[in-house]
Structures are given as C-alpha cells and as structure tokens.
Amino acid sequence: MRIEKPWGHEIRWAVNDKYLGKILHINAGSRLSLQYHEQKDETIYVMEGTAVVHLDGKTHILSCGDSLRIQPGQIHRFSAPDECYVKLIEVSTPEIDDVIRVEDDYGREK
C-alpha cells in the first residue's frame, strides 16, 4: 500500500501482528519529523542514495548497503541530501502508530 507523505512516500509491504515492512522514499532535501517510539524497534537499510540520520543528538551518514537499528526511546530523524532522494527499507515491530514527534517541518501533531 502506497501512502503519500509530505517528505515523499512510503510503501507498506508487510503489515501483520508480528512485524512491519516499509519502503520509504524521501525526496531530495526533505526530512521526516524528529521523533521517537515508546515500543517500536526498527532497523533501516539504505537501498538507494545517501541517508542523513540524526540519532540521539549525533549525525550519521549512511550509504547504500548500510543499516542501522533504532530502539525504543531513541530520538531520531531521517533526511535526504539536497541533491538526491534516498530510498530506505524499514523492518520493525508492528506498532505502526507509535510515533511521538519532537519536531516536525510540516506542522503535524506531536
């Protein structure tokens, strides 16, 4: 299922009571909200492009083939550089609505 987002779109390819699988396409120069999860545990894999990841106050640059685990409570944000989109695979526990936004460029609810 494709879902349009203000930063690009996501495709949910696996949704069940055990796990969640998504592909995130982040447009060039866009970023997701600064957020954390109370229960959701996720692992990100970079399929295409370069991802800029802000995790617990530090900035990480992930290239194609890199992966990163984000555990509950870790404040994080994914973004794409100005010159190129990034495509990520996310596999996580199934808590799809477990998002607490700390900061959001698009005015969405925290």
Report residues per predicted region.
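A short glycine-rich, His/Asp/Glu-containing loop-to-beta-strand
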Residues: 1-36, 40-41
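Short acidic-glycine-tyrosine-enriched beta hairpin
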Residues: 57-75
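A generic "binding-loop/recognition-motif" signal
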Residues: 19, 30, 39-40, 58, ...
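Glycine- and acidic-residue-biased ligand/ion/polar-headgroup-sensing regions
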Residues: 39-52, 56-57
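Short beta-strand His + acidic residue motifs that chelate non-heme Fe in jelly-roll/DSBH
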Residues: 33-34, 44, 53-54, 70, ...
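A short, sequence-level motif marking secondary-structure junctions
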Residues: 39-40, 66-69, 106-108
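Double-stranded beta-helix
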Residues: 2-5, 77-110
